[in-house]
């Protein structure tokens, strides 16, 4: 199943490297081989979703790198 999410927070070093941009919409999907939810960045590279809490998808390194919320189907 594919879900579309909007970036609500992107850590400065990630934004500088153009991985994700706040306010843009990205695709989240479940990868059977990796057995994990993945998110595609600006260049189509898949990132592991590190954490899902309160309806938010998070990517972590040593700190929170990015946060996303689900986009309504009508958008």
Task: Walk through the language-model features, giving the residues of each.
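Basic/aromatic-rich interaction segments and small domains that mediate binding to polyanionic partners
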Residues: 6-59
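SH3-family beta-barrel domains
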Residues: 1-13, 64-75
């Amino acid at each position: 199943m594919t879900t579309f999410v909007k970036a609500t927070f992107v850590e400065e070093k990630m934004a500088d490297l153009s991985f994700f941009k706040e306010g843009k919409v990205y695709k989240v999907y479940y990868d059977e081989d990796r057995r994990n939810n993945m998110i595609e960045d600006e260049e189509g590279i898949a990132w592991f979703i590190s954490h899902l809490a309160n309806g938010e998808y998070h990517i972590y390194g040593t700190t929170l790198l990015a946060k996303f919320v689900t986009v309504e189907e009508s958008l």
